[in-house]
């Protein structure tokens, strides 16, 4: 009998190879080349309030942020940059709009990099030679940050709106001005609030240059909406090997941006997975309150710093299989739970003891992992089927 081909494409077993880009150094963090994708965020404080800004940077650092950006709209903010850059635990990027003088102030202050927006800095093109000279002397990278909302009027007239082509043309034009003056420590972003436009812009940019790319969906929205937009856009690009740093823009506390960014990287296996709680979404087969159980286990293991997969399952259909695949798991039913460790049932406990037992066993496994030198990391919790 002749075999019938269903015409199904082969399922890739890994992401596309990383795009080859030049590497720059943002303070202590390598960006581009073969460096890992890093997570950025931005402070929401007045930069001139040095204490509040440093406090927020400390909180971001604790959440796993690797690079932080601070706004610099006033002279008071510019005056604060030196102290903030010196005392910050992670590299500080100064975010400059409208006034070229603040670019020089940020470089003089010792910021790890400077973001410039070519769409709104007055006489920016005329200042590129001076900026390139100052940045070269201090080895300060420049991020050319193009945003759909502040695109140059010339390009809006040419394209009619902020198309992917308009964003890319703006970025590469400005990069070429720096290159004319011998400066190549450049990172580029081409942000749009529409993930489809944003993805297409980055694909075009990746095909036309070797600059490291900072990914972002601008004005992504409230936490839930912004998370979805960013996950869709970043997932598409990172799976194609495009992207060297990411920032999840949310109308939420900055630490939430970092949490989402880290989880996106972990979901794509671009970062060591941390604590991962896999729990079923619940259905009519569930014989326990899965939501409550998962929340209690998550709360009990908060802060655990080893890559541990814990399965919390509510019935006998998928429960045993998922529990066996995890480092630790429970398959619940009939008022009790079977506790699995590394695929083996070690005990059966009453429903009232499930959470307590899982936490005890998780701590035992974590202790052994730490003794064995297993890499640590920030917690991650994901709820899935």
From Swiss-Prot:
Q: Which gene encodes it?
A: ispG
Per the record, the domain of life is: Bacteria
Q: Does the keyword Isomerase apply?
A: no
Class of the enzyme per the UniProt entry, highest EC level: oxidoreductase
Q: Which residues bind [4Fe-4S] cluster?
A: 280, 283, 315, 322
Q: What is the E.C. number?
A: 1.17.7.3
Recorded protein name is: 4-hydroxy-3-methylbut-2-en-1-yl diphosphate synthase (flavodoxin)
* Pfam short name (any one): GcpE
Q: Which family does it belong to?
A: Belongs to the IspG family.
Q: Which cofactor does it need?
A: [4Fe-4S] cluster
Function, as annotated, reads: Converts 2C-methyl-D-erythritol 2,4-cyclodiphosphate (ME-2,4cPP) into 1-hydroxy-2-methyl-2-(E)-butenyl 4-diphosphate.
Entry GO MF terms? 4 iron, 4 sulfur cluster binding; 4-hydroxy-3-methylbut-2-en-1-yl diphosphate synthase activity (ferredoxin); 4-hydroxy-3-methylbut-2-enyl-diphosphate synthase activity (flavodoxin); iron ion binding
InterPro entries of this UniProt entry?
Dihydropteroate_synth-like_sf (IPR011005), IspG_bac (IPR016425), IspG_bac-typ (IPR004588), NO2/SO3_Rdtase_4Fe4S_sf (IPR045854)
Q: Tell me the keywords, alphabetical order.
A: 4Fe-4S, Iron, Iron-sulfur, Isoprene biosynthesis, Metal-binding, Oxidoreductase
Q: Name one GO biological process term.
A: terpenoid biosynthetic process
